[in-house]
C-alpha cells in the first residue's frame, strides 16, 4: 500500500534525527537506511532530504563534516547534536500522543 506523502512530510525530521541518533550518516545512506528500516514503505528523495538537512544544520540539530570515502571521493557526513537529541525526544513524545489520539478517534484498539 502506498502512503500519502503528506503523512510522511511532518515526521521526516524526526525520522532523520532518529537515524542520526544511532550513527553519523551521509545523505544517500540516510535515504537507503530509511527505506530499509521501513520495509521499503518510506522513500525519501534527495531533493527533499538535503534542504531538510540544511535547515536542521541551521537550527543546530545536526552538524556536518567531510571525510574521504574508501573510493577516494569526499563525502559529507551528518551528526546529531545535543540540541538535536532534545528535539528528537520532543518529536517522539509529540508523535506518541498524536498516534494515540488518531487511533482513538479511528476506534483502533477499542472493543
Tell what function each PLM region has:
Residues 1-5:
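Short, Lys/Arg-enriched N-terminal segment that forms or immediately precedes the first helix
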Residues 6-48:
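N-terminal helix-turn-helix DNA-binding core of bacterial DNA-binding proteins
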Residues 49-56:
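Basic amphipathic alpha-helical segments that dock to polyanions
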Residues 57-74, 79:
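Beta-hairpin "wing" of winged helix-turn-helix
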Residues 80-84:
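Accessory beta->alpha helical hairpin/"wing" motif in late/C-terminal subdomains of nucleic-acid enzymes
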Residues 86-111:
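Amphipathic alpha-helical dimerization/coiled-coil segments
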Amino acid at each position: 500500500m502506498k502512503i500519502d506523502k503528506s503523512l510522511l512530510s511532518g515526521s521526516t525530521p524526526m525520522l532523520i534525527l532518529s537515524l542520526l541518533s544511532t550513527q553519523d550518516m551521509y545523505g544517500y545512506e540516510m535515504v537507503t537506511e530509511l527505506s530499509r528500516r521501513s520495509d521499503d514503505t518510506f522513500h525519501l528523495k534527495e531533493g527533499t532530504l538535503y534542504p531538510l538537512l540544511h535547515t536542521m544544520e541551521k537550527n543546530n540539530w545536526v552538524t556536518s563534516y567531510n571525510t574521504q570515502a574508501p573510493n577516494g571521493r569526499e563525502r559529507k557526513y551528518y551528526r546529531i547534536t545535543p540540541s538535536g537529541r532534545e528535539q528528537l525526544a520532543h518529536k517522539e513524545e509529540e508523535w506518541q500522543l498524536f498516534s494515540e489520539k488518531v487511533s482513538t478517534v479511528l476506534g483502533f484498539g477499542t472493543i
